[in-house]
Structure formats: C-alpha cells, structure tokens
C-alpha cells in the first residue's frame, strides 16, 4: 500500500493512502496503529479513497510534544491539506473517536459525515480518570508492553476471545514497540479532553455510531444516550 509521510512540528507522521473515490479517513485507537484497519481496507479499497494514519507515537509515526486530542486532530487536518483534500468522511475507534470529535469541533467544514466506533463524545468521569492514573502507575512500574498485554484482551467479547485467541495473541505481539512515554501521553491527553456532546447536537452532517453489546470500555448507556 502506498506509504506517505508528513512532517508536523518536526516529527515524522506516517500514513497510508489507497484507492480512489470519495475520501474516508480511519483513525485508530489507544494501543493500536493504522494496521488495525487492514480488513476494512481490503473490503473498501475498490470503492473509496482511504487514508489510514498512524497517530503520533504509534506505528511508524513519531510522538509529538505536548500531545492532545486537538493536536492529533491538527495532524489529520494537515494530512488532508498535504493531499489537497477539502472533504472526507471520518471514522474513529475509541481514542480515535475522541480525535474525530476534536476534528468535528475545529474543522467541521472538512466533514461530509463522521462516525464513532466504540467511542464517545463525553469526557472521562472521575472514576475513569482514577482508572487511567492507576494505568499510568502500572506503565511506569512494569512497562508499556506488559500494560498492553494486560488490557488488550478486554477489548474483545468473551465469544471473540475464545474463537480468535491466535489472532488476538498475534495482534498483542505486534504492539511490543510502544513506549511508556507514548502510552502515558495518550492517557493524560484523554483525561484532559472536554465534553463535546454539543458537537453531536449541532452537527448538520450524518453521524454513525457503532456500539458493542459486550463493550466493557465505553458504557453502552452513554452511547445510546448520545445517539
């Protein structure tokens, strides 16, 4: 797949661009990189022009200083600008959905539609912030990979965990490159993100919600309330 790079504030940002047609941007989540979308790429590449970035600090992209949901949405906007694109549909998974919401707030004119894939427009609750702080302490003590090995199986339903153990183990092994600095920066950025539920209320473009019945990370009632 065509691999491209963007220099953003002195850091190299990697993304893939494939296909032709209307542009769809897929933004991965925490503890992932753009390869998580490979099956979607295979299915959609003959129908759309797909842009799949590695977020700063993930995959082949370098971490940028002072990372926030807003600065990562700025990176996505710069990719679109570099490719002379003025519109797209954007789908964000988990943390990628938080970035999509920041993009919708600051660059709404670029969006034909957007979607939240197991994600939310709401900020972290105090309980969630406490959980993230515990995660940060675990990362500091045991390292990034041990943390990802501990939490990643929780992203899959009990049925999937049983049926796809080999695939899940392979996916987890692919995450060994992550650094503590990157994961801690992501957690701190997610803890600081604001409530963007009003963006959904005010949006004039179609919005897609993909909700998991067995999602243990994003409360399903919060997602249903936002729909």
Each language-model region and where it sits:
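Conserved hydrolase catalytic core segment
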Residues: 43, 85-125
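The conserved beta1-alpha1 loop
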Residues: 27-29, 211
